[in-house]
Swiss-Prot record:
Source taxon at top rank: Bacteria
Cellular component annotations (GO), alphabetically ordered: cytoplasm
Species of origin: Clostridium botulinum (strain 657 / Type Ba4)
EC number assigned by the record: 2.1.1.-
Residues holding S-adenosyl-L-methionine: 163, 184, 206, 248
Source taxonomy: Bacteria, Bacillati, Bacillota, Clostridia, Eubacteriales
HAMAP family with a match to the protein in the record: Methyltr_PrmA
Protein name (database record): Ribosomal protein L11 methyltransferase
Pfam families the record matches: PrmA (PF06325)
Amino acid sequence: MDKEWLEVCIYTSSEALEAISGILYNTGVKGVSIEDPKDIEFKKKHPGDWDYFDETLLKVKDTAIVKGYYKEDDKFNEYLDYIKKSVSNLDQFGIDKGKGLVEVHKVNEEDWENNWKKYYKPTKVSNKIVIKPIWENYDKKQEEIIVELDPGMAFGTGTHETTRMCINALEKHIKEDRTVFDIGCGSGILSIAAAKLGAKHVIGVDLDPVAVKSSKENIKYNNLDNIEILEGNLMEVVEGRANIVVANIIADVIIFLTEGVKAFIEKDGYFIASGIINSRKEDVIKKLEETGFVIEEVREEGEWVCIVSKIN
């Protein structure tokens, strides 16, 4: 393995972190780290929820930073051009890119390994669920449920507002006999949380083979045998119906999927949808209601929204 890596730093807004992470995952990125000033505020407000915390993160100010790590090869310049163009175009999708500045630095392999992992610390994201990176130690409290996670190259670390809101919604609605479908499962974090909260059976689906592999590995870390991970889209690879369908994606995809998703939800079942920026909330609600869903709850955290709807 090469001893030097290229670190691509994108200076942006908290709002754009998921979108930019997705841009990096579309390239040959070998690892991603995120520095979000909103996570620092969350830590300050919930100091008891963190077992360990890197105090240097308190120096993070108003600018969010996404860092991607690459080997220096013939494809890198192509990847870099794609990243710059994609970040520049975020405004067209109603996403505030902030500074939108892209920089490249050379870093040592050891620095890279430390950088991308040191920002992921055990985090309590709901009344019960604690997300714990597999390389960290954590003293579990009696009522807590631990989700072991190595996000690797797949999206989903548990620290983002949308993930927290989805987990809280799952915690509220899951019962022991429930079946859950997780659309765009990424690292498998929501599938694993659902299973550990008591779901009888969970199916996670993702179009990205890297995400499918990551989900399966994380399921093994958590010693679960009631989760099935499939590569593809919900309409083509899943049969049957679920009591709960959860999708932490983006507003446009949720709007596109809404009519199809309805056919996969049991009567009195729930559709938990997040990844929705606040400015698109009404668009998603309108589509859900037009499709026959009843809005049960709208959760908001920062600039993000989670909508819980129900089929009667």
